Amino acid sequence: MLNYNAPTDGQKSSIDGANSDQMQTFFWLKKAIITARKEQYFMPLASVTNMPKHYGKTIKVYEYVPLLDDRNINDQGIDASGATIVNGNLYGSSKDIGNITSKLPLLTENGGRVNRVGFTRIAREGSIHKFGFFYEFTQESIDFDSDDGLMEHLSRELMNGATQITEAVLQKDLLAAAGTVLYAGAATSDATITGEGSTPSVVSYKNLMRLDQILTENRTPTQTTIITGSRMIDTKVIGATRVMYVGSELVPELKAMKDLFGNKAFIETQHYADAGTIMNGEVGSIDKFRIIQVPEMLHWAGAGAQATGANPGYRTSMVSGQEHYDVYPMLVVGDDSFTSIGFQTDGKSLKFTVMTKMPGKETADRNDPYGETGFSSIKWYYGILVKRPERLALIKTVAPL
């Protein structure tokens, strides 16, 4: 009887002689396993400001500070009695009834040179930078590779890589530009963030309430506009809430959070949202914040305090031979807080320029006289203009293992 035995297991079939073997020992599943493209979370938050030609690489914009604002610092102030005062902003941002009453711009019957105020403007600016990378391939890599869709896969991954780089750079810039920063626990800086002691740097419900209060005082809208659609031409407005971005490491901590009454603070999306209002990556809400889980969320490895054997189970990294706590951000992006800067764009998304030259006459030169090597490159311009840094907010905390 003729039997088949698997050659890959080291046993020949009965028909194969000493110098013979099966030619096909596996079935090739032609459709390659493609790593899922990392989704975008931050790029859809802003439109793109187009940098025109012949104006350099920097965009500037003025922000005019309101009259009644502590940031309106000027030397033009004259009060109701005619005396020169330090700041010409009347009572500024004060909410004290006594202070407001004493600085009201009252006029007498004769008027006079009183109640002079001044104004302040702040210049914001951002610059664009050029990014790019390429890969090379030979004619034989195309002709003889077992995957006849090789070039298609490589072209797709080229574009995906550029998109992911842009997403990471934008996230880095948003974290660095945050004008409102809170530290969990008793910490007052990155270097004092710890998971130990009686007041560890673990985010609490009170931290979220405090952050919402500060953002409200900063006039941050409780709605967020997100660019959607396959061509990035549609928008979706998320109202009456603020959007908070966190890494996967913090989600267990948030799900275990208790409110001021000892009840579960975290509400899963299935309890309040439908398919039309849920955002990409949204996992739930706490107080006024809708929580977006970002798998590629950045953090500061080893930027916290030195860890000891008393670490109850929070993430650390080795720095100069010592374990230090990792610092994890919880990022809130207020509406219209920033804009991306591009060059020759459509005003909705960054424009990528791809150039491909196949092996042959196009690539033949003194370095490759036979024209056996081709290449594909991608380049783009990127920049960010932070218009209202006070609407970008962070809570810095430790994260459990």
From Swiss-Prot:
Pfam family, one: Phage_capsid_4
Keyword Transcription tagged: no
Main location: virion
Keywords, comma-separated and alphabetical: Capsid protein, Virion
GO (cellular component) term, any one: viral capsid
Compartments where found: Virion
Disulfide feature: none
Summary of the function given for this chain in its UniProt record: Assembles, to form an icosahedral capsid with a T=9 symmetry, about 60 nm in diameter, and consisting of 535 capsid proteins.
Protein name: Major capsid protein
Organism this protein belongs to: Enterobacteria phage N4 (Bacteriophage N4)
Gene this protein is translated from: 56
